[in-house]
Amino acid sequence: RTTRNKDEGRGSPQGSPLSPLLANIYMRRFILGWKVLGHERRLDAHIVNYADDFVICCRGTADEAARVMRSMMSKLKLTVNEAKTRLCRVPEESVNFLGYTIGLCHSAQTGRSYIGTRPSAKKIAALKAEIHELTSRRWLWTTVEDRVVKLNRKLRGWSNYFCLGPVSPAYRAIDRHARHRLRQWLRGKHKLQSRGTSRLPDARLHDKFGLMRLCDRPRSFPWAKA
């Protein structure tokens, strides 16, 4: 923890429940003003936000939308994080928002291209790092049941959120990594010399030890969730 907020006399500590509440209050004023002042209709620019993270989706009016946004933020005495602010032309470019990459996707069924969402490379890498930590050598003293329970909990939570768009490539990559890491952990725990998969095939990891296979999970869409 730092004393930056206290020293500067502004802001709230990161992780404080007050932070998202204040963010929603100020963003509500900004979004209402955007609509009431007619910017949404005039610029055909629609705001999508979560707390203080937001994107403005528009057609050919990005420069003007950015100028108006900065002007309104200034009047609300809010500071725009310029390091995280940029103009993005989709589908030539992609943008990351709330862990998803929004950009050009390809349909596996038709082969056609479309603008859609997929889990971002950063979030996939972060999950792989967490799987690696859960199967590191410092956990060799635990049981395989304990490792699988913790791995499955992590995999289930991640896939419950990342279930939109073409997720199969990400799921396959994560499944491979989870199997590889659990296999490495089992070799270390039981001092197995074989480096192949003959003694620890995929079926054994999933069927005997119970490791979750993301590719077999039914798709769970947000509008069907409580």
Where are these regions (language model features)?
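Non-catalytic terminal/accessory segments
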Residues: 1-226
